[in-house]
UniProtKB/Swiss-Prot annotation:
This is tRNA U34 carboxymethyltransferase. Pfam families: Methyltransf_9. The gene is cmoB. It catalyses: carboxy-S-adenosyl-L-methionine + 5-hydroxyuridine(34) in tRNA = 5-carboxymethoxyuridine(34) in tRNA + S-adenosyl-L-homocysteine + H(+). It comes from the Bacteria. Signal peptide: none annotated. Belongs to the class I-like SAM-binding methyltransferase superfamily. CmoB family. Its EC number is 2.5.1.-. InterPro entries: CmoB, Mo5U34_MeTrfas-like, SAM-dependent_MTases_sf. One of its GO terms (biological process) is tRNA wobble uridine modification. Gene3D superfamilies: Vaccinia Virus protein VP39 (3.40.50.150). Homotetramer. Carboxy-S-adenosyl-L-methionine binds at K73, W87, K92, G111, D133, P134, S135, V160, E161, Y180, R295. Catalyzes carboxymethyl transfer from carboxy-S-adenosyl-L-methionine (Cx-SAM) to 5-hydroxyuridine (ho5U) to form 5-carboxymethoxyuridine (cmo5U) at position 34 in tRNAs.
Amino acid sequence: MNLEILQKKKEECRTWKNVEPWFLQLKEACKIEKSNLKIDYGDWFSIGNRADLGDEEYEIIVQTAKKLIPWRKGPFKIFDLEIDSEWQSNIKYNLIRPYFNLKDKVVADIGCNNGYYMFRMLEDCPKRLIGFDPSPLTLHQFEFVNHFVKSDIVYEMLGVEHLEFYNHKFDFIFMLGVLYHRPDPVGTLKSLARGLNSKGEILIDTFMIDGEEEICLTPNKRYSKIPNIYFIPTIPALKNWLERAGFENIEVLATTITTSQEQRKTPWSFDESLEDFLDPNDSSKTVEGYPAPKRVYVKARKIM
């Protein structure tokens, strides 16, 4: 597979009719050059203060952030402008944070969205940090934030299927909220294994259903109004998938029920969010009648 051709898409996409307005607005924001800005790696990933900008500069920041709506992951605070994303991604990050040490490691984030988790990971001082996501919108959101952060994070407009062909292997791979979008979950986990160095580790989360049987739910057409949800396993079924893909030391870190504290509508998001995806008369079910979203977080190590 020739990744160079695929990587050129990163630049070519900027001329697409729906993408060009984002790119042109981003270019305006990137004319603002500031150095030695204060960075806060907390729940609100923050860069700079309002006092760092003149009025015209701040207005460009506001207009750029608004042009790049919807912001699904965050929250961010850019020169004190609060971008309150649909997902409070700090909740997930704080949950998994005790389970990894990225210092001096080569790290990948598959389905990295706008890079919120990667910006938080900078505090861990990884050797190299690379995000994979084919979305032009989230690429521009990432570049907007990173223009001021000035990190060495690499953002590749590639998917998990390209991981094993990348030009080097990884010590640690995150794949959060991706597996249920893949029609071949075992094949996807095998791609992660092939992208790892020997004894490398993964940390994933995915939708789950309760039960001790080795089975999974296969939604018909949509799940929680999402069309591309293919397989939702029990924990025993997920462990089987991981073992078949070449992983050992499989550790269940946590299970959580998605709440409106974590996912909700904001002025920076889509018109619909979690409350619109659940049965209005029974929040334990989706609008389609399936069990409401529940997630399992798992860490595992490559066998060889």
